[in-house]
Amino acid sequence: NLVQFSNMIQCANHGSRPTRHYVDYGCYCGWGGSGTPVDELDRCCQTH
């Protein structure tokens, strides 16, 4: 869910970027998703 996503992002980047910057990040972070993940963070979004 989006609350867990927000918590994961805050933990992973140590608060260096606001969570909202990732809502439309890569191919899988945010709503829906398709294609090839662009990096490890996007791959994590694909998995979860």
From Swiss-Prot:
One of its GO terms (cellular component) is extracellular region. SUPFAM superfamilies: Phospholipase A2, PLA2 (SSF48619). Belongs to the phospholipase A2 family. Group I subfamily. It comes from Austrelaps superbus (Lowland copperhead snake). Its EC number is 3.1.1.4. Ca(2+) binds at Y28, G30, G32. Its main location: secreted. One of its GO terms (molecular function) is phospholipid binding. Pfam families: Phospholip_A2_1. It is found in: Secreted. Keywords: Calcium, Disulfide bond, Hemostasis impairing toxin, Hydrolase, Lipid degradation, Lipid metabolism, Metal-binding, Platelet aggregation inhibiting toxin, Secreted, Toxin. Its cofactor is Ca(2+). GO terms for biological process: arachidonate secretion; lipid catabolic process; phospholipid metabolic process. Gene3D superfamilies: Phospholipase A2 domain (1.20.90.10). The lineage of its organism: Eukaryota, Metazoa, Chordata, Craniata, Vertebrata. The active site is at H48. It catalyses: a 1,2-diacyl-sn-glycero-3-phosphocholine + H2O = a 1-acyl-sn-glycero-3-phosphocholine + a fatty acid + H(+). Snake venom phospholipase A2 (PLA2) that inhibits collagen-induced platelet aggregation. In terms of inhibition of platelet aggregation, superbin d is less potent as superbin a, b, and c. PLA2 catalyzes the calcium-dependent hydrolysis of the 2-acyl groups in 3-sn-phosphoglycerides. Binds 1 Ca(2+) ion. This is Phospholipase A2 superbin d. Expressed by the venom gland.
